[in-house]
Curated annotation (Swiss-Prot):
Belongs to the frog skin active peptide (FSAP) family. Brevinin subfamily. Coiled coil: none annotated. This is Brevinin-1HSa. Keywords: Amphibian defense peptide, Antibiotic, Antimicrobial, Disulfide bond, Secreted. Signal peptide: none annotated.
Amino acid sequence: FLPAVLRVAAKIVPTVFCAISKKC
């Protein structure tokens, strides 16, 4: 889609993964 969407996803995905895996 839009580059802006990819940027937001790039910030959200690691955060969500961090919260789920408990490994930051």
